[in-house]
Amino acid sequence: KLLENRFNVVEILKALIFDLEKFTNEREHNQKVIEDNYWLFGEQFHLVSADKNFEILLNNYFAHLEIDNKKPETIDNKEKLKRPDIFISRKSDIPDATNNDLTIEENIIVELKRPSVVIGSEQFQQVERYLRFIIEEERFNSLRRNWKFILVGKKVDDYIIDLYENQKNKGQKYLVQSIRNYEIYAMTWD
């Protein structure tokens, strides 16, 4: 039954992206499917927030990390009202002979684009602004936190293809930017 349900989810996404392209938009269609089926990015992830602003995202993130705050966190930055589509996270134990408690956090922010939008400079810059926001807001940062920003659409343009070319020495398919423990990927649905 689980496999059948997952197969059906993939078929629904295919129909939304390839057959119903003119009618599909990211917020009402693709995002709802991904939000309910974030396993598409890995079984081990947990949904932290969907279509919420960065201030809510930070508070949900602290709850996910089991950081006990007496009052909600606030962010003093006008960009805090930006709303990434999906934010998922996981914690993994890292083998270390000197420290039994060492874990690494992997965080993924997903930005979905309607099938009619070709991913290019404008979409990349939107995700790059999210990356900059996370870097500049110290409460999101730690040496034990890795961040991936994944931009997903039906097609990419030459600008993105050039960014792939620029990052090919890193050995990561779809990678378009890498800074310290932050990476941006531009992926297509196929």
Predicted regions and their residues:
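Charged, terminal alpha-helix-loop-beta segments
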Residues: K1-D190
